[in-house]
A protein has these predicted regions:
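Extracytoplasmic "Venus flytrap"
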Residues: 16-40, 64-70, 91, 164-173, ...
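Extracellular/periplasmic Venus flytrap/periplasmic-binding protein
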Residues: 71, 118, 126-236, 273-280
Length: 422
């Protein structure tokens, strides 16, 4: 099922085509809807305010995949001949399927803060990008944050940290890093898998009640997150020792648990909830004109903002390519160059209407950018997230060698000769 959300009459020769693999339906629709609305609204904003990107109108087409990998791949195969500017897979499972396909089709693939971590090695994965940061890097920032809270990294020795994770490619992604860090810092790691969709967690939390780990870190998704918070409250596990990853830190994850979620924390790579110049423009050019994809009251939510960010990066890559190559509608190779030469400075964030966001720099070798991580805390009475940390640097000295080893293995298995970045 496809639905053109942003339509105009420009001919194919003078329009930027963008495809959206969305999940407004299915088990994860409560997360998929705000995400998809952010996707659509940003492109509507560019068309309404700027006449598109570089004066070229954008045509956006959603393909509803219901968070189903097989359907998402079918969507991709059906729409790839339109040459989408940037393919955004919207799930780790889909990312793994599309990495080899997009490389053959010469279409850039961006999985923002999810997907295959070792795809950060641009010499092996020239068509794939996973900036601003990855699950492995996030895991190092979480352990740094916990260590600092305990009074120093040496205080982790002898402590127990549980990882409650969605039993999927996504949920397992942080485990190798957490194991390496457990050896490095001497904490005991409990690995507790939760099967899809995550409504049955009694056995998991019974183990936590027995073992009483010092901290619980969660890589959850959808209903798994709110269920976990309710189960933690039921065994009186302290919320100030329970930290979610950035897919376990949206309003949808905490609101169903009510007052019990108060004090719960999560990682994030952006702030939410604030009025920004970008939000003001979205209201003025999109919602005030009756062209919004959703409810204007929800444009401050975590997942909506993440949807916006996906298309901010995709369209910045298109803009980079237009300027560098002197073209109106860049090719896949040219947009790939635009992603690989992405450098979003403080001044760029001001221009984009999101002042205060951290700088991002992508290179030929590094498709992740090593972006630092923020932590936020939920206030159940105010129903809002508050950022409570500075930007926490990631341990690149730990994760980059792991990424390079995994990428080298992938290259050997797939007969890929790593390119020379010069």
């Amino acid at each position: 099922m496809t639905s053109p959300f942003v339509v105009n009459t420009a001919s194919a020769a003078e329009q930027i085509y963008q495809m959206g693999l969305t999940y407004r339906t299915g088990p994860y629709a409560p997360n998929g809807v705000p995400f998809a609305n952010g996707f659509a609204d940003y492109l509507t904003l560019l068309n309404e305010r700027d006449g598109g990107i570089g004066g070229v109108p954008i045509v956006y087409e959603e393909c509803e995949m219901g968070y189903n990998t097989k359907v998402a791949v079918e969507c991709y195969e059906k729409l790839k001949s339109n040459r989408p500017a940037v393919v955004i897979p919207n799930s780790t499972g889909v990312t793994y399927q599309l990495i080899p396909k997009t490389a053959v089709d010469k279409l850039p693939l961006l999985s923002m803060g999810y997907g295959r971590t070792s795809g950060a090695v641009g010499t092996v994965f020239p068509w794939y990008f996973n900036f601003p940061t990855t699950y492995w890097s996030q895991a190092t920032a979480v352990i740094s944050y916990i260590g600092a809270e305990m009074g120093g990294m040496d205080k982790l020795k002898g402590k127990t940290i549980a990882h409650v994770f969605h039993n999927s490619a996504y949920g397992k992604e942080a485990n190798p890093t957490l194991k390496v860090l457990a050896e490095k810092y001497g904490y005991e790691l409990m690995l507790l898998a939760v099967d899809h969709p995550g409504q049955e967690q009694k056995a998991t939390w019974l183990q936590i009640r027995k073992k009483r780990p010092d901290y619980v870190f969660m890589s959850g998704w959808g209903i798994m997150n709110s269920t976990a918070i309710k189960e933690a409250a039921a065994i009186n596990y302290p919320m100030d020792r329970f930290i979610g990853n950035w897919w376990s830190g949206s309003e949808n994850d905490v609101l169903p648990a009510g007052a019990a979620a108060n004090g719960y924390r999560s990682a994030t790579f952006h702030a939410s909830g604030a009025e920004t110049p970008l939000h003001e423009d979205i209201k003025k050019y999109v919602y005030d004109k009756g062209k919004g994809a959703g409810d204007v009251g929800r444009i401050y939510e975590v997942l909506y903002i993440r949807g916006l960010l996906n298309h901010i990066f995709a369209m910045e890559a298109v803009s980079n390519a237009q300027k560098h190559f002197g073209v109106k509608v860049p090719s896949g190779e040219q947009v790939r160059w635009g992603l690989e030469n992405m450098h979003v400075t403080a001044a760029d964030w001001e221009r984009l209407g999101l002042p205060g966001f951290a700088e991002i720099k992508v290179t030929c070798e590094d498709h992740e950018g090593g972006h630092p991580v923020l932590f936020q805390r939920w206030d159940a009475s105010a129903k809002s997230w508050t950022v409570i940390s500075d930007w926490i640097p990631v341990m690149r000295d730990v994760v980059r060698p792991m990424m390079e080893a995994d990428a080298a293995k992938y290259a050997a298995e797939n007969n890929i000769t790593p390119r020379d970045c010069g």
